[in-house]
């Protein structure tokens, strides 16, 4: 199964009129992706409560929406993101308790409506995750997280990500086309198309194919990570400034790349192999994200859902002057 890259849809929540807009937007997204009236109603309910809680306890924030492509059915991801002081999660899981101290259905009820529910909250803010799938589909959740945003919400994004699954194996791609806008997107999409044809090929040969596909475009930076779930190994190949990290509960290590421009010039493409990575998080990110973050500065975050981790990193470390992509994969669960 292949999953092609797409942007995160962002809805500002700054006044009560935007709650209804969030509900309608989420419900339509669900209906357009095969949810029946009952399941789409669950999506609408969750979007309403999450947007309401953002407004009540934080004053302002965002909902991030994403389609979750699946082999049996698509899902809908809703993330509520804010920068307010954290709240008492245990109290908020009680039915009828709102994070704003007013009457609400409670996050406990939200968690029952969603197939996947997770949260990270501290003094820097809160990220709440709800993933919903059609109840009849019994779709399995993929332990991956994506946060991708274009500069100034431009429809064109020079960053591209792509994931391929083959049983217990995974191959992940991130490309950052030089600059931003339509020409950067054209360069990155050309590389993505070549990658999608043979995502599990030898990375040296795969990179050559991508380089040829991107020749004549602006070119860009690239990283490919290939995970073997049976052996518990990761092979990482990078050209340019796509960041990569392997993170466990108590340590992290950066993944090495070579200088150059794919579609332009680079000297070599040596893959680097990493053993015993089952149970680790793989994080790949474009240079729209600052590199000075440390996941262990956020107690407990390493144990949260990858989608929560991606949203926290984007919230706190986005540079704000380029397209940005954050891809997080829990490697032990990389199954299609």
Language model features with spans:
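Conserved beta-strand-loop-beta-strand hairpin that lines the nucleotide-binding pocket
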Residues: 1-8, 51-140, 164-173, 204, ...
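PP2C/PPM family metal-dependent serine/threonine protein phosphatase catalytic domain
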Residues: 141-158, 207-215, 240-273, 277, ...
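Conserved ATP-binding N-box helix of the HATPase_c
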Residues: 37-64, 209
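Catalytic core of PPM/PP2C metal-dependent serine/threonine phosphatase domains
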Residues: 183-251, 269
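C-terminal catalytic subdomain
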Residues: 1-2, 10-13, 208-213, 218, ...
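Bergerat-fold GHKL ATPase/HATPase_c domain
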Residues: 1-45, 145-164, 336
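Short acidic, Gly/Ser-rich segments with clustered Asp/Glu that frequently serve as metal-coordination loops
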Residues: 85, 177-185, 288-293
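N-terminal entry segment of metal-dependent catalytic domains or homologous docking segments
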Residues: 133-178, 183, 187-193, 265-267, ...
């Amino acid at each position: 199964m292949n999953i092609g890259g797409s942007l995160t849809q962002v809805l500002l929540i700054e006044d009560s009129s935007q709650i209804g807009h969030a509900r309608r937007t989420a419900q339509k997204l669900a209906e357009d992706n095969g949810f029946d009236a009952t399941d789409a109603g669950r999506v609408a309910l969750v979007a309403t409560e999450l947007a309401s809680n953002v407004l009540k306890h934080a004053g302002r924030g965002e909902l991030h929406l994403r389609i979750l492509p699946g082999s049996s059915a698509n899902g809908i991801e809703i993330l509520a993101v804010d920068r307010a002081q954290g709240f008492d999660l245990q109290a908020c899981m009680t039915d009828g308790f709102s994070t704003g101290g007013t009457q609400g259905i409670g996050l406990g009820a939200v968690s029952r409506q969603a197939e996947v529910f997770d949260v990270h909250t501290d003094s820097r803010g809160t990220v709440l995750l709800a993933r919903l799938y059609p109840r009849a589909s019994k779709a399995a959740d993929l332990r991956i997280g994506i946060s991708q945003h274009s500069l100034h919400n431009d429809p064109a994004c020079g960053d591209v990500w792509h994931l391929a699954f083959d049983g217990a194996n995974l191959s992940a791609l991130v490309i950052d086309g030089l600059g931003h806008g339509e020409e950067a997107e054209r360069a990155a999409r050309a590389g993505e198309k070549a990658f999608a044809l043979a995502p599990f090929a030898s990375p040296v040969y795969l990179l050559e194919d991508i380089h040829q596909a991107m020749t004549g475009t602006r070119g860009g930076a690239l990283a490919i990570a290939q995970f073997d779930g049976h052996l518990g190994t990761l092979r990482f190949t990078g050209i340019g400034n796509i960041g990569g990290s392997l993170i466990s509960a108590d340590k992290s290590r950066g993944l090495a790349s070579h200088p150059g421009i794919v579609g332009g010039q680079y000297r070599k493409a040596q893959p680097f192999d990493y053993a015993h990575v089952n149970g680790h998080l793989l994080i790949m990110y474009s240079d729209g994200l600052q590199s000075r973050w440390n996941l262990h500065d956020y107690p407990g975050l390493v144990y949260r859902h990858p989608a929560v981790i991606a949203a926290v990193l984007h919230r706190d470390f986005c540079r704000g002057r380029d397209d940005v992509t954050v891809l997080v994969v829990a490697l032990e669960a990389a199954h299609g």
